[in-house]
């Protein structure tokens, strides 16, 4: 492990799948194969480490990038619906594809629980990002169709599907 971003990337699955309260620095050392000194060099404590994980790995994926917004704003309505992923789907796919999390749908719920417990303003930051997302979707879709898209229904159905996926009925 060479740098700060490597430590964050190795710790993110721990946050997504575990209880931050129960994870000790010694556990982090073992899991990411780094010494306490290397971790402390970049992060003064667990709270700082957690905040950096959320700020640098969770929120950037939860929010649509400017490039994604640009592409979606130019898409046809059917392409928009085929390409658009809710913030929850973006997090789920990122956890699965980039971090190898086995049950990323379950991990989403855990991230929200951990974030609301250990990150000041987590809930309000998520709310602000969701409002930006809804405003963006309303501008894109609202200008192209006559009927009103019930954004709350879209998100409720999406969260319901992710919840069912998280149940791991295998």
Task: State each model region's role.
Residues 46, 53, 57, 61, ...:
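Hydrophobic/aromatic residues within well-ordered alpha-helical segments
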Residues 52, 66-102, 152:
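Hydrophobic alpha-helical connector segments
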Residues 78, 100-149:
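Amphipathic alpha-helical packing segments from all-alpha helical-bundle domains
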Residues 1-3:
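Short, Lys/Arg-enriched anionic-surface-contact patches
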Residues 14, 60, 136-140:
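Short alpha-helical functional segments enriched in proximate histidine and acidic residues
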Residues 86-90, 134-170:
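C-terminal peripheral helix-coil segments that are non-catalytic and often amphipathic
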Residues 6, 10, 14-56:
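Helix-turn-helix
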Residues 6, 10-17, 64-71, 108-111, ...:
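Solvent-exposed, amphipathic alpha-helical segments
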